[in-house]
Amino acid sequence: MFSTSDQVSKMNSRILSALLILGIATCVIAGGFCPKSRHPQCNLSYKINDCCAQSDCRVGSVCCVEGCGNVCRAESDTPLGEKFVDGSECKHGHVFPKKWYQFR
C-alpha cells in the first residue's frame, strides 16, 4: 500500500491546506477598522462617495465615512473612524443635498 513517507507527506499537505484555509478565512472575517478621519468637517456643498460597499475597496482597505463622502482607507488596528455599513443608502460619485424647496 502506502509507505510511511507517503502517509506523512499526505498528512503534511492536509495540515498545510487546513492552515491556508484558516488564514484566508481569518483575513476575510477580520474586516479591519477605519483610521481616524482626515477631514471630519466638510466645507463643500456636496459629497463625493468613492465607495458604497466594503467590496468597492481593494484588499487591505475599508470603506470609511468621512466628512466629504465615503472613501477607501487602509485598515487600522483600532476603531478610530466610522466604517461604512453595507446596505446603507449610498450613491457613487458627486452627491448634492436636496434644494431648499425639496424639503418637506
UniProtKB/Swiss-Prot annotation:
It comes from the Eukaryota. SUPFAM superfamilies: Elafin-like (SSF57256). Disulfide bonds join 34-64, 42-68, 51-63, 52-90, 57-72. Keywords: Disulfide bond, Secreted, Signal, Toxin. Residues 1-30 form the signal peptide. Expressed by the venom gland. Residues 31-76 form the WAP domain. It is found in: Secreted. Contains 5 disulfide bonds. InterPro entries: Elafin-like_sf. GO terms for cellular component: extracellular region. One of its GO terms (molecular function) is toxin activity. The keyword Secreted applies. The keyword Lipid biosynthesis does not apply. Has antibacterial activity. Belongs to the venom protein 11 family. 02 (wap-2) subfamily. This is U20-lycotoxin-Ls1d. It comes from Lycosa singoriensis (Wolf spider).
